[in-house]
């Protein structure tokens, strides 16, 4: 459904005028035990496999600057849940849950799972609880700060006849589950609390830098679940500051990484950032990491949305955006590669810890996956060189001789032209080596010290340069125009002189 229509129905169900009034109204409605609002919403949107609330919060309320909120696409959320092993899980922790996009895709696969959803932004928590209650889930929602470990509030959702019953409870001190799924804020700054190095998350691997919390989220997931999959920017896979490199090295050496999956770019509506699925496993049965490159495995969808602000020329206009998504077949291929430890050229490679060590613990799949060389088809080098020289000959037919000062005033980059014919050009030397022939030197411009010199010279005895022909045509057209203008003023002068001459006012 188009966003404007969806927003209108949402405001109607909640009986609000402004979207900013939604969070308190949702909490008031769903914690009162009255299910009329939930029932009305389901009447509008009976397909609970879709997260309708996500697009509303993302467009109107998401904080992309400080909290780095950019919500997960359905196909990427499904890929995350599937690779985490949600189908066999009894408990699932959605870390940095947002409005519940990841949890909803996990719930679509395993409705019997118990979900624990933790989120820091108290504005989105009502949307999250609303989404879970709609689906009659058994769950705990935590208002907490994953990075600092602080937990402020919690709500328990218990499945009933139609919708979950909601009750506020004391926040749990720890989380221990079968699987963790997460799309945390990317590259976010954070603060080290006193004695944080003693925290269970960091005492083995060290503290990630305050400049970037990516590895803090990774380590938080690692201690919370038997298996975890995080959607992260692909910058986590290599380089980084020293502490990040050391953490990555330690995680690899401790055999905690199950697989690394490189995603296509443009999978999010608000950013083109390239991401990966960072898959962790505390109970691996082998010592290999499966690297998968999905960057070229996708289909495209076009989303349509009316303009939301401005005049009618904007609000009546349909804006289109194309995004990349995974098909069900794409996700299945990914899952099979992870399970079977597949080696497929240009797609997947199962690599040992020793292999990864040889690449200085880089986790970039492209360093491990076999690249297939395909001989490119092209014309003979001599033919290509002949065409290049043909162009050079045509350029050289017309030579511009111009004073340096005048050339600079006209915008010529003198140094660029002077460097064109350097004798040690590597490309020129390579071409001569391959073909046995030389590139024709450029001789179509010359800079002089002669004051005001500006000359076009035909450099060929056999023909006239096409450039000069064009210049002459333009010159002739402009002279014709000036002649017409001159004749107009001569006629005006004649008509002015004639009466005065005839009257004797002026003497010839």
What do the predicted segments below correspond to?
Residues 69-73, 347-351, 443-446:
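Short coil/turn segments at secondary-structure boundaries
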Residues 1-110:
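Class I S-adenosyl-L-methionine
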Residues 374-508:
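Amphipathic alpha-helical coiled-coil/heptad-repeat segments
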Residues 155-158, 174, 181-413, 417:
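A conserved structural/catalytic subdomain of Rossmann-like adenosyl-cofactor enzymes
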Residues 69, 117, 206-210, 240, ...:
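Alpha-helix N-cap/helix-initiation motif
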Residues 72, 213, 271-273, 485, ...:
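A generic structural signal for residues located within well-ordered alpha-helices
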Residues 74-182, 187-191, 233-235, 246-247, ...:
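Conserved S-adenosyl-L-methionine
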């Amino acid at each position: 459904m188009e966003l404007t229509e969806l927003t209108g129905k949402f405001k109607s169900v909640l009986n609000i005028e402004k979207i900013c009034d939604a969070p308190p109204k949702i909490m008031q409605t769903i914690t009162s035990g009255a299910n009329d609002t939930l029932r009305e919403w389901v009447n509008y949107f009976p397909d609970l496999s879709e997260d309708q609330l996500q697009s509303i919060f993302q467009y109107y309320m998401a904080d992309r600057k400080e909290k780095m909120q950019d919500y997960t696409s359905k196909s990427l959320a499904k890929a995350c849940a599937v690779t985490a092993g949600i189908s066999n899980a009894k408990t699932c922790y959605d870390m940095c849950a947002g409005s519940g996009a990841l949890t909803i895709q996990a719930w679509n696969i395993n409705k019997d799972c118990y979900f624990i959803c933790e989120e820091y932004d108290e504005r989105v928590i009502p949307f999250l609880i609303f989404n879970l209650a709609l689906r009659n889930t058994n769950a705990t929602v935590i208002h907490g700060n994953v990075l600092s470990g602080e937990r402020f509030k919690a709500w328990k959702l218990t499945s009933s006849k139609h919708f979950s019953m909601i009750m506020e409870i004391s926040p749990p001190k720890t989380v221990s589950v079968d699987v963790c799924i997460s799309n945390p804020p990317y590259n976010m700054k954070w603060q080290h609390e006193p004695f944080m190095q003693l925290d269970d998350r960091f005492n083995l691997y060290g503290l990630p830098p305050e400049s970037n919390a990516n590895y803090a989220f990774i380590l938080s997931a690692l201690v919370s679940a038997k298996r975890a999959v995080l959607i992260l920017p692909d910058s986590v896979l290599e380089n980084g500051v020293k502490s990040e490199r050391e953490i990555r090295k330690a995680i690899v050496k401790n055999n905690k990484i199950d697989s690394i999956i490189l995603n296509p770019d443009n999978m999010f509506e608000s950013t083109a950032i390239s991401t990966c699925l960072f898959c962790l496993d505390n109970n691996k049965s082998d010592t290999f990491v499966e690297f998968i490159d999905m960057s070229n495995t996708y289909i495209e969808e076009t989303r349509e949305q009316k303009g939301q602000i401005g005049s009618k020329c904007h609000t009546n206009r349909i804006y289109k955006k194309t995004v990349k998504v995974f098909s069900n077949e794409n996700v299945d291929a990914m899952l099979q590669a992870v399970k079977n430890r597949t080696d497929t050229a240009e797609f997947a490679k199962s690599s040992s810890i020793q292999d990864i060590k040889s690449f200085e613990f880089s986790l970039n799949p492209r360093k491990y996956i076999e690249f297939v060389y395909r001989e490119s088809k092209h014309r003979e080098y001599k033919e290509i060189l002949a065409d290049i020289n043909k162009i050079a000959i045509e350029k050289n037919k017309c030579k511009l001789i111009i004073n340096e000062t005048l050339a600079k005033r006209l915008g010529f980059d003198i140094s660029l032209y002077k460097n064109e014919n350097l004798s040690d050009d590597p490309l020129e030397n390579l071409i001569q080596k391959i073909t046995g022939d030389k590139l024709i030197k450029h001789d179509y411009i010359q800079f002089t010290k002669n004051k005001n010199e500006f000359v076009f010279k035909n450099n060929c005895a056999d023909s006239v340069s096409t450039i000069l022909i064009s210049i002459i045509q333009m010159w002739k057209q402009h002279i014709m125009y000036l002649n017409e203008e001159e004749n107009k003023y001569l006629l005006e002068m004649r008509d002015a002189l004639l009466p005065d001459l005839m009257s004797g006012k002026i003497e010839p």
